């Protein structure tokens, strides 16, 4: 069994599946975070805690325009 863990500033999502399913969830959640401008960390690991994939995305900070 493989696990996908997604952490954002406001929530934690935990899902489990086959390796292919967990990797697909990883890619879909990272794409969603990037499209929404949400910082997140995604990890895919197995039953023994071995990490197969880990990635962090930091959303760009909005800069207020000076007047």
Name each region found by the language model.
Residues 1-12, 38-39:
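Short aromatic-glycine-(Arg/Gly/Cys) micro-motifs in beta-strand/loop hairpins
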């Amino acid at each position: 069994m493989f696990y996908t863990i997604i952490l954002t500033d406001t929530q934690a999502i935990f899902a489990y599946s086959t390796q292919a399913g967990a990797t697909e969830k990883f890619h879909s959640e990272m794409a969603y975070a990037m499209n929404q401008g949400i910082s997140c960390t995604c990890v895919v690991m197995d039953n023994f805690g071995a990490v197969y994939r880990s990635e962090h995305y930091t959303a760009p900070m909005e800069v207020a325009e000076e007047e």
